[in-house]
Amino acid sequence: MALKHFNPTSPGQRGLVLIDRSELHKGRPEKKLVEGLTKSGGRGGNGRIAVRFRGGGAKRLYRLVDFKRRKQGVATVVRLEYDPNRTAFIALIKYQADGELAYILAPQRLKAGDEVVTADKVDVKPGNTSPLRTMPIGTIIHNVELKPAKGGQIARSAGAYAQLVGRDAGYAQIRLNSGELRMVLDTCLATVGAVSNPDHSNQNLGKAGRVRHMGRRPHVRGVAMNPVDHPHGGGEGRTSGGRNPVTPAGKPTKGAKTRVNKATDKFIIRSRHKAKKGR
C-alpha cells in the first residue's frame, strides 16, 4: 500500500507521512477471534518496570492470529484488516471445507477473494503454506517455524522475509534479512511470500501525541538523569557521561553480545555479525 503525504497546514501535519489503509476493512474485527488485552505499563509480574518508556496508549483487542497453519485444505480470503498489535496487516480467511474462520499474517500481493492452501505440496503463491522440504530452492518465505508444530517465529513483522537457499540431511538452510544463515528441520512449515506493509518503516508520525497513542512514553537519556537513576547521571553542567555507554543496570551497551544459548549455535551456519563485517 502507498504512503500518504500531508500538507503542512499545522505543526502536527508538517512532515506527516502515514500508510494509506483505505483498502483495509473499516469495521470491527471478527468477534470470535479477539480477546481482551490488559495493559501492563511495561511492568513485569512483580510490578517493577521491565521495559522502560512504556505506558498509556489506545485500548486494543488482541487478534488471535494463527501462526501454526496446521489445518490442511483450501481457504478463501474474506478481507484484509489492520491489527494494532503488530506492524503487519492480517487477513481473515474462511476454510471451504467447514466454513471455519481464522486470522493469518497477510503477505504482500494478497487480496480479498484469493485462495490460500495448506498442504504437503503447494504452488508458489503468496499465503500458501507447506513444509520446507517440498518448497523450491530460492523461494521467498515468511512465518517460518524453528520447531515443527510450534508455530512460525521467523519473519513475522512488516515487510520481513527469509529465503530458502538449500537442503541437506533433513535440514533446510534459510537466509534471514539480518544476513544470518541458519538451519531448521525441513519438516517445519513456512508460508510463501514476504509480509505485508513493507512501507511501515517509512512512516513519519509527525508529532509526539501519535507516538503516545501507541503506548510509548518519552525516551530519557541517561546523561540527563541524576546519579541515583543511571550510571551516566549527575555531574556539574552538561557531561558526556564520563564512561563507555552502559545500560541503567551498568552493563555495556552499543554492541555487546548478549546471546547465551550455546545449544543452538550449531544451527547457525553464518552469524549475522559476521555477515555484516563481510559486506
Swiss-Prot record:
GO molecular function: rRNA binding; structural constituent of ribosome; transferase activity
Keywords from the UniProt entry: Ribonucleoprotein, Ribosomal protein, RNA-binding, rRNA-binding
InterPro entries xref list: NA-bd_OB-fold, Rib_uL2_dom2, Ribosomal_uL2, Ribosomal_uL2_bac/org-type, Ribosomal_uL2_C, Ribosomal_uL2_CS, Ribosomal_uL2_dom3, Ribosomal_uL2_RNA-bd_dom
Keyword Ribonucleoprotein listed: yes
GO biological process, one term: cytoplasmic translation
GO CC entries: large ribosomal subunit
Transmembrane intervals: none
Entry keyword annotation includes Ribonucleoprotein: yes
Annotated family: Belongs to the universal ribosomal protein uL2 family.
Annotated function: One of the primary rRNA binding proteins. Required for association of the 30S and 50S subunits to form the 70S ribosome, for tRNA binding and peptide bond formation. It has been suggested to have peptidyltransferase activity; this is somewhat controversial. Makes several contacts with the 16S rRNA in the 70S ribosome.
Protein name per Swiss-Prot or TrEMBL: Large ribosomal subunit protein uL2
Originating species: Caulobacter sp. (strain K31)
Lineage: Bacteria, Pseudomonadati, Pseudomonadota, Alphaproteobacteria, Caulobacterales
